[in-house]
Amino acid sequence: MVKKLWLVILSALLCSACSKPTGHITLNFSFVVDNDSLRLDTCMYQNAAGNLYEVNDVQYFISKVMLVDDAGNTFDIIDNQGIHYVDIRIPGTLRWNISDEIPVNHYTRIAFLFGLEGAQNTTGYFPNPPENNMSWPDMIGGGYHYMKINGRWIDKAGVRQPFNLHTGKIANNTGFADNTFTVTLPLEQFTVSKNSNSKLTLQMNVNAWFTNPYLFDFNIFGGSIMQNREAQEVLRANGGDVFSVK
């Protein structure tokens, strides 16, 4: 009799857990340069170091995405292993319709890892494009680029020079520095409601990569930084101010 009673109680608890209301979220991705929407292929921007520049491509990975509620409880996104690839020239990547059944709640923060780590950042993890087009050379760590921003800047002689801001693992004195970093952003009045789809927009300010706490000057670092440890570390440090949620 006692055993049967426990089975009834357990079944009731399981049913209660299964019936908790859930909703969905859609994460959109946008790009600005300070207060203006990013326009590609137009040399109209100036960074804090005084470099005039244009942007031709922006591509990046985020991973380990999670929501945090009022009580500090976290909900880890498992759709696509918590990874999303963004390419400004591929409209389908600028919207992530997350398939997870997310508990109805008020969420105060969203957090994610900029880049990839562990098994997700090993060569061959992504078998198909466009993600596998982000492959990072095995000789300097393998895996994948975390970000590519390609464009041109005008150097001190007034000549338009190409730049490729490519970040990823890079060799250091003890092995490889992964150069990932965690971003945590506050959410204002964001609620997931039952059977509804709540929307967030993750906005990248391209100019912020060059600003704080360190100035990034193309005339100092040049246009190619894949094996430039100092330049990679500057971008990593500056990444804390790059993203906001709208």
Residue positions per predicted region:
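Sec-dependent N-terminal signal peptides
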Residues: 7-10
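Positively charged n-region of N-terminal signal peptides that target proteins for export
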Residues: 1-5
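C-terminal motif of bacterial Sec signal peptides marking the signal peptidase cleavage site
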Residues: 14-17
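A short, solvent-exposed, low-complexity linear motif enriched for acidic/polar residues
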Residues: 19-246
